[in-house]
Amino acid sequence: MKGTPQYHFIGIGGIGMSALAHILLDRGYEVSGSDLYESYTIESLKAKGARCFSGHDSSHVPHDAVVVYSSSIAPDNVEYLTAIQRSSRLLHRAELLSQLMEGYESILVSGSHGKTGTSSLIRAIFQEAQKDPSYAIGGLAANCLNGYSGSSKIFVAEADESDGSLKHYTPRAVVITNIDNEHLNNYAGNLDNLVQVIQDFSRKVTDLNKVFYNGDCPILKGNVQGISYGYSPECQLHIVSYNQKAWQSHFSFTFLGQEYQDIELNLPGQHNAANAAAACGVALTFGIDINIIRKALKKFSGVHRRLERKNISESFLFLEDYAHHPVEVAHTLRSVRDAVGLRRVIAIFQPHRFSRLEECLQTFPKAFQEADEVILTDVYSAGESPRESIILSDLAEQIRKSSYVHCCYVPHGDIVDYLRNYIRIHDVCVSLGAGNIYTIGEALKDFNPKKLSIGLVCGGKSCEHDISLLSAQHVSKYISPEFYDVSYFIINRQGLWRTGKDFPHLIEETQGDSPLSSEIASALAKVDCLFPVLHGPFGEDGTIQGFFEILGKPYAGPSLSLAATAMDKLLTKRIASAVGVPVVPYQPLNLCFWKRNPELCIQNLIETFSFPMIVKTAHLGSSIGIFLVRDKEELQEKISEAFLYDTDVFVEESRLGSREIEVSCIGHSSSWYCMAGPNERCGASGFIDYQEKYGFDGIDCAKISFDLQLSQESLDCVRELAERVYRAMQGKGSARIDFFLDEEGNYWLSEVNPIPGMTAASPFLQAFVHAGWTQEQIVDHFIIDALHKFDKQQTIEQAFTKEQDLVKR
């Protein structure tokens, strides 16, 4: 190479070609090249002194240059033909990379998926260790280029398996991320041929301790010798735990008899954690300290076009990702879902090449299961001719059925306008593809969706009317005016509604209209999402939720079924008992039997329980219709009074002296949910009535504590019991789950509150604040959850309607 005056790249803007051009420029060589399009990569090469031409022409090729081409360059390319006619020296990209690595300790990463991520992580670790490696990587990092010639003898590079060029390399260490049924057209359509090439490649490494392969990949397992890494217990580098917190991953692994705990990676997704584990193994093998590795992974800045944020607005999120194979798409969407919870995920997918789409036509439909909406657009052909077997509208229908999502086809030229009308507050859009789909994110960089119209509903007919107003007043402070326009709907004690924008003025009014009146109905119709902050009957028991479902409106808080079930304390006890959660022993009573046999009821209770006992109504709030009784006369009196409020009553064994422990929940028990707390509610005398709970009639409010002074085992126990109850009740929306903790350390379920108090003094919101949330984030989540519940139901209803239409035809 020393005597070569110049290198000319056909397609110099390509991510792989530009990396090698950068290395040559760093080493002092003269570089020129041509490409069809201007790009950031070309600008960065020009800044280093490269001469770059737009388009391909024979005049661009210097007479004395080595001409570099890649497998994507067509045989009839004018510059390629010119080089042949002139008998210029021609080098395939892989041959040049091999020459550039001569004399270096090369660490090569190959495999169907994850090459760029893994090689970028290895590069970042060696840079953090001050090793100054050379590298040629198929992606741009936020803080460095894709190619660089360093001062050390370490060289990190991707080794592309797609075109059979692995034969050119003699690596010192390798990572093989996985093998898939991809690019088999270069292997006579035979997977065995690809496996053989991978085997030959790995065998070039003389030290098997420097051959790392994915032990979770069934094709690699048994076909490669070296160090297996992955989640399977038999892997030599075993990832023993993984969890994702927002956009970061945390994992622990064992390797060579050592355990490395809680590695923090600034990337989401199990697949990225596996890539990072492989990078850790390589770095440890090369003698890099684990603390340096930790630091590098924690601050890793990611790779261009790998879940790269494209927009500015905080009201929604637009991400761009290079994923274009079904495995990559599924992994990417899974990591996004785990990061954003119940926010609506809109996947915008541009298939890459007709040949790849045809090969993967059976697997693509199931790749979008973690999305909520899929927009399918035109195939990026990369010069290929269309295939008759591919009909995008049919593929959209297959995606809908196989991924259980709404899917539609939108022409590429119409997508930006479509999204401007479709994106709403809190949406997460992910463009997927290796073609020119990146232009969509660029076009929406400064876009802001319109505000959501929120209807805050409060008051109500129950005796907890005043608490509802206090809760709504507190919640309204944290409804962001940047995201939402708020209207208030106040229900008076007679069930009449009034609406407006001025909450204090509405509270002072006393009149109202039927919810079916033209004024109220019109106001409800304009609302995007309803937010009920109602307590007790006609608001917390499924009644108002059913009304909202009839209106066809999203609503925050508990679903109809959770609200109705939780407000039936007897049904709640039966459900909890069925899943092994201890409940306070009780005896149910109904009004009909009580009226005919009160003496028998009293006798049964006295024989079952000892005094004091607790009398409770079955369908009222958590502190209404609840009485502590200490003798037979008081028992009869309070049962009679309780039946004035409810047709179902029960008597519980007293838990006086026990501690009242509460766990707060929001989200969907079947997918994403969060549990906060526990907290303790402490009364002055042990029994907390309605007045003490809220501080009425001059009584001091019951104290709320988050410092429970309990063992970790006890805290884990109550959270597990609360989780069991929430799942058994198919929790959707919100709930506070209350327990008694007796002197022996046993927990007993007391009740479940579907819309807990949300006043400034209430523990429900405080619990999430203690967990690190802001009040605004809690309110946002209520609205996100409401939209999620509604969207899922709409998708099901649309599918049902579609199937009905097909049957009719």
Curated annotation (Swiss-Prot):
InterPro entries per the UniProt record, alphabetical: ATP-grasp, ATP_grasp_subdomain_1, D-Ala_lig_Van_CS, D_ala_D_ala, Dala_Dala_lig_C, Dala_Dala_lig_N, Mur-like_cat_sf, Mur_ligase_C
A GO cellular component entry from the record: cytoplasm
Binding site for Mg(2+) 1: D738, E751
Cited HAMAP family: Dala_Dala_lig, MurC
Organism of provenance: Chlamydia pneumoniae
Pfam families membership: Dala_Dala_lig_C, Dala_Dala_lig_N, Mur_ligase, Mur_ligase_C, Mur_ligase_M
Disulfide bonds: none
Pathway named in the protein's UniProt entry: Cell wall biogenesis; peptidoglycan biosynthesis
The family this protein is said to belong to: In the N-terminal section; belongs to the MurCDEF family. In the C-terminal section; belongs to the D-alanine--D-alanine ligase family.
Residue ranges, annotated region (UDP-N-acetylmuramate--alanine ligase): 1-450
Enzyme class: ligase
Cell compartment(s), UniProt: Cytoplasm
Protein name in UniProt: Bifunctional enzyme MurC/Ddl
Residue ranges, annotated region (D-alanine--D-alanine ligase): 451-809
Record: residues binding ATP: 111-117, 606-661
PROSITE patterns reported for this sequence: ATP_GRASP, DALA_DALA_LIGASE_1, DALA_DALA_LIGASE_2
Entry-linked PANTHER family: UDP-N-ACETYLMURAMATE--L-ALANINE LIGASE, UDP-N-ACETYLMURAMATE--L-ALANINE LIGASE-RELATED
Reactions listed under catalytic activity: UDP-N-acetyl-alpha-D-muramate + L-alanine + ATP = UDP-N-acetyl-alpha-D-muramoyl-L-alanine + ADP + phosphate + H(+); 2 D-alanine + ATP = D-alanyl-D-alanine + ADP + phosphate + H(+)
Residues in ATP-grasp domain copies: 573-784
GO MF, one annotated term: D-alanine-D-alanine ligase activity
Cofactor: Mg(2+); Mn(2+)
Keyword Cell wall biogenesis/degradation attached: yes
GO biological-process terms attached to the record: cell division; cell wall organization; peptidoglycan biosynthetic process; regulation of cell shape
UniProt-listed Enzyme Commission number(s): 6.3.2.8, 6.3.2.4
Binding site for Mg(2+) 2: E751, N753
Gene for this chain: murC/ddl
Function comment: Cell wall formation.
